[in-house]
Amino acid sequence: MDINKNDTAVLVTDPQNDFLSEKGVTWALVGDSVKENKTVENIERLMRAAKSNEYEVFISPHYYYPTDHSWKFGGTLETLMHEINMFDRSGVLSLEGFTGSGADWLERYKPLIEDGKTIVASPHKV
């Protein structure tokens, strides 16, 4: 495998409070695994290594907006995510209530994500 800056990047999915913080709504489900695997620390190490070696870093956030809660069909996990308001935001173009919410970045990642170099993709739903 040839890893080079021309065609290799790091993609981080869902580096958000609801998933990675002890205060997140899914902590009871994922917390033991996150701690055991040192997920938070390893994601940070990965982003720092990529940046220090000048590799692109992409973030794929998970957001739900009020309109998403009216979906007619959804799987078990999607239904649960809506019920516990996981990754909820007040609107597509609004940051009202975003800072520190479950949808916000984990605080320790903010300097790495909000550095003006990291590319944040459009949000995914599933």
Where are these regions (language model features)?
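Active-site acidic carboxylates
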Residues: 1-116
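Glycine-rich oxoanion-binding loops at beta->alpha junctions
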Residues: 119-126
